[in-house]
Design a protein with these regions (language model features):
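PLP-dependent amino-acid enzyme catalytic core
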Residues: 1-205
Length: 205
């Protein structure tokens, strides 16, 4: 069986253009939601940063599945041809990416097989399975990546990386574009952006 790695979102130094980001935004359409941006109202934080500083939150917890991860999974999967999509996808995750693969596979009419470390949150594992994900639990992340490569080779599934690749960066950049668009309306100007980082996929965008 042909290995599907050529179809995956391979790491690249290419920086997504604004045109590409906007095209990705249009392509995803209503498969993801434009999450709200709201001012942070907290007296303790206001005292810490000073009264003249306004803090805004981009609330990705209101994204479908509860995290920003579907943005990347859907962008990669929408680029698959019909045969690759029919074979399904695979991935490594401790939770949010696995859930996003399940969500994406369901709405695109395919299947997902995910390898997760045994330390993954039990509730997240349950949510994955409720989405129809075939979950395999292993001892650690290194073993998970090795196992998922075996699945990719044996079944022809496309490996969707949890945070690397130009397509993933491009779709995550949509989050930043939404953020800027939201702040233009009240006439705010950004001095700094603080981004929580795990694998770095959101930060890359």
């Amino acid at each position: 069986m042909t290995n599907s790695s050529a179809a995956t979102d391979q790491p690249s130094l290419d920086v997504p253009t604004l045109e590409a980001i906007r095209a990705t935004r249009k392509r995803l359409g209503e498969l993801v939601v434009t999450t709200p941006t709201r001012p942070l109202m907290d007296d303790a934080i206001a005292n810490a940063v000073g009264a003249s500083t306004r803090l805004w939150l981009k609330e990705e917890l209101f994204q479908r599945t509860g995290s920003f991860k579907p943005r990347g999974a859907l962008t990669v999967m929408l680029d698959l041809d019909a045969a690759a999509l029919a074979r399904g996808v695979t991935g490594v995750s401790a939770g949010n990416h696995a859930i996003s693969l399940g969500y994406s596979a369901r709405i695109l009419g395919t299947t997902a097989k995910v390898v997760m470390p045994k330390t993954a949150n039990a509730f997240r594992v349950q949510v994955c399975r409720e989405y129809g994900v075939d979950v395999t639990l292993v001892d650690n992340v290194a073993e998970a990546f090795a196992r998922v490569r075996d699945i990719e080779a044996a079944e022809g599934r496309t490996f969707v990386h949890p945070y690397e690749g130009p397509k993933t960066a491009c779709c995550k950049a949509r989050t930043g574009l939404e953020f800027i668009d939201h702040l233009r309306a009240p006439g705010e100007e950004l001095d700094a952006v603080i981004v929580a980082a795990g694998g770095g996929g959101l930060t890359a965008g």
